[in-house]
Amino acid sequence: MAIHLYKTSTPSTRNGAVDNQVKSNPRNNLIYGQRRCGKGRNARGIITARHRGGGHKRLYRKIDFRRNEKDIYGRIVTIEYDPNRNAYICLIHYGDGEKRYILHPRGAIIGDTIVSGTEVPIKMGNALPLTDMPLGTAIHNIEITLGKGGQLARAAGAVAKLIAKEGKSATLKLPSGEVRLISKNCSATVGQVGNVGVNQKSLGRAGSKRWLGKRPVVRGVVMNPVDHPHGGGEGRAPIGRKNPTTPWGYPALGKRSRKRNKYSDNFIIRRRSK
């Protein structure tokens, strides 16, 4: 979708740049309410995830990541805004009467038809196993475990590339730059996730950020020593340490935090680029 620039009529719209949001009238049988998760607190009320709280109430949309309506053609009826993700979603009416939401593929318009199965055309929005796709195909919503549903490349603008097939595995280049192996029997959707201009958005004011449930972030260097290892000192003092740390004293900014000898290390050919 296109990015809309506001006229500078007020200070809050001076730097605002938002996408042209499509209206959302979700179907009642495809939504359900969510219980608020304590605004970043645990069961004792202690903050465990900082900078969270507030925000507008949301209804969760049930998204079909499995695409298990095999060999049944569906038509895109609406393209809707989803408050739970950056990508848009589209409502599909299948030939057997089933109605489901899927992630909106880039370039798909109302009236287009999609289908999932083993021998379906390599067309944007169609879902099929990796073994039936030619090399170089751009894909998204990729399964890691067969039948579990898509888990990779689901964010707005995300796209992966099928670069090799050998034996029982397919080699994919993911949006992060990581190259890894996945079973050829796993399914994926052809094309790129829509709303590629989401990274060009500028909320323009603090209130828009609060609507998203995100609270202000304060630098540790301006805190007191009791609140952060970087705090204290006279005037604009440096952090007083060799390397920056988290509020709890652990290394920050570059320290690798992935668990060693993780089972999935055997499937990763090249680590993601920093």
Curated annotation (Swiss-Prot):
- Asked whether the keyword Ribosomal protein is assigned, the reply is yes
Q: Provide the protein name.
A: Large ribosomal subunit protein uL2c
User: InterPro entries, from UniProt?
Assistant: NA-bd_OB-fold, Rib_uL2_dom2, Ribosomal_uL2, Ribosomal_uL2_bac/org-type, Ribosomal_uL2_C, Ribosomal_uL2_CS, Ribosomal_uL2_dom3, Ribosomal_uL2_RNA-bd_dom
Q: Where is this region: Disordered?
A: 1-22, 225-274
Q: Name the predominant localization.
A: plastid
> Which protein family is named in the record?
Belongs to the universal ribosomal protein uL2 family.
GO molecular function terms attached to this record: rRNA binding; structural constituent of ribosome; transferase activity
Query: Which Pfam family, an example, fits this chain?
Result: Ribosomal_L2
The GO cellular component terms are: chloroplast; mitochondrial large ribosomal subunit
PROSITE patterns attached to this UniProt entry: RIBOSOMAL_L2 (PS00467)
